[in-house]
Amino acid sequence: LHMLEDAGAECIVIPCNTAHYWFDDLQNVAKARMISILDATLGDIPPSARYVGLLATNATLATGLYQKKALARGLTLIQPEDAGQALVMQAIYTLKRGDKTAAQALLLPQIDSLIARGAQAIIMGCTEIPLIVAGHERAIACPMIDSTASLVRAAIRWYESWPDTRASLTGEQRLTA
C-alpha cells in the first residue's frame, strides 16, 4: 500500500472481493483514496431489487463482507445452498483449468436456483464468475452485477472528479461509466 502511495498513487483499488476482508484496516492507514469493490457493487444494484443473489468464493461468503453491507442497505442476500456452493467453487476451478463450457454447465444452474429462490439481481462476487457467464447474460432473467465492472466504473468516476483531471479534459474526452 505504502509502495503505491510512495510511487504517487492517489487512489487505490483492490480488484479482489475476498481481499476486501482487510479493506478497512488498509483504509485506516492509507493516505490515498481507496475505493471498495463491495460498495461499488452494492451501489450498482437496481433500486427495485431488494432480494439479491450472491455468487462468490467460500472465503468471501464466510467473511460476511457482502452480507453486512447489504443488510445496512436494506437488501436481503440469497446465497447458494451448500451443495450449490460446492458447484460454484467447482465452476471457478474448472474455468481456471481452461474449460469454460464445463464451468458454465456447473454455474448456470446455480444462477437459475437463485432466481427461483427470489433473487431480483445477482452479484458476481468473484472475478472469474463474469468470465463464466459471458455470452449467457441475455438468457438470465435478472440483472447480473459484475463486481469488477462496478469497481472500474467507480474508479472512473473518481478519476473524472479529481481536480487535475477535470481541468485537463474536455467534455468529449471524459470517460463514460
Regions found by a protein language model. Give the residues of each.
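Non-catalytic structural scaffold of enzyme domains
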Residues: 1-177
